């Protein structure tokens, strides 16, 4: 299994390290030539979603990534990655717009508004969640499954091959979310 991690900004190295701990081969996606071979899965990490969207266009990655996702390549978007995948952005324009959710950028405030929470994920036990200038999911489409909520707010969801998280699972020690994604790729959950 090979997972491509968008490596333009954000905590992409932490995602790579987490996957390597799980014995998964990874590669960095920095330009179109990095996608000559179709990956088994994609990770769109955190960062600044407006800048990332512009870089995707400038580097010629936008259409290729969108096409891979729309044709079924599993993708996990964390924080800014969630914003890139959201079909609707309150007060803004969507980017890739492949997942039937509505999101609000930086819903939890500035960097000082960062926090940690513990909540059940995907029907499993509690996991630690790190929120850094996190987006909020305010609406999910009829085919979207809510996987986690904190204080009644959706912070993780899945629609078919797309998994989005408001938080940063790569910044903790728990591998559960990445394992969930790998099982999603393997078709076992």
UniProtKB/Swiss-Prot annotation:
InterPro entries in the cross-refs: Class_I_gatase-like, PdxT/SNO, PdxT/SNO_CS
UniProt KW keywords: Glutamine amidotransferase, Hydrolase, Lyase, Pyridoxal phosphate
A GO cellular component annotation in the UniProt record: cytosol
Protein's UniProt keywords contain Lyase: yes
Biological process annotations from GO: glutamine catabolic process; pyridoxal phosphate biosynthetic process; pyridoxine metabolic process
Enzyme Commission no: 4.3.3.6, 3.5.1.2
Pfam families named among the record's database cross-references: SNO
Keyword Lyase: yes
Pathway connected to this protein: Cofactor biosynthesis; pyridoxal 5'-phosphate biosynthesis
Active-site residues (renumbered): 79, 168, 170
Catalytic activity: aldehydo-D-ribose 5-phosphate + D-glyceraldehyde 3-phosphate + L-glutamine = pyridoxal 5'-phosphate + L-glutamate + phosphate + 3 H2O + H(+); L-glutamine + H2O = L-glutamate + NH4(+)
Binding annotation for L-glutamine: 47-49, 105, 132-133
Recorded superkingdom: Archaea
GO molecular function, one term: glutaminase activity
SUPFAM superfamilies: Class I glutamine amidotransferase-like (SSF52317)
NCBIfam families: PLP_synth_Pdx2
Protein's job: Catalyzes the hydrolysis of glutamine to glutamate and ammonia as part of the biosynthesis of pyridoxal 5'-phosphate. The resulting ammonia molecule is channeled to the active site of PdxS.
UniProt record similarity statement: Belongs to the glutaminase PdxT/SNO family.
Quaternary structure note: In the presence of PdxS, forms a dodecamer of heterodimers. Only shows activity in the heterodimer.
Protein name in the entry: Pyridoxal 5'-phosphate synthase subunit PdxT
Biological source species: Methanocorpusculum labreanum (strain ATCC 43576 / DSM 4855 / Z)
Lineage: Archaea, Methanobacteriati, Methanobacteriota, Stenosarchaea group, Methanomicrobia
Gene encoding the protein: pdxT
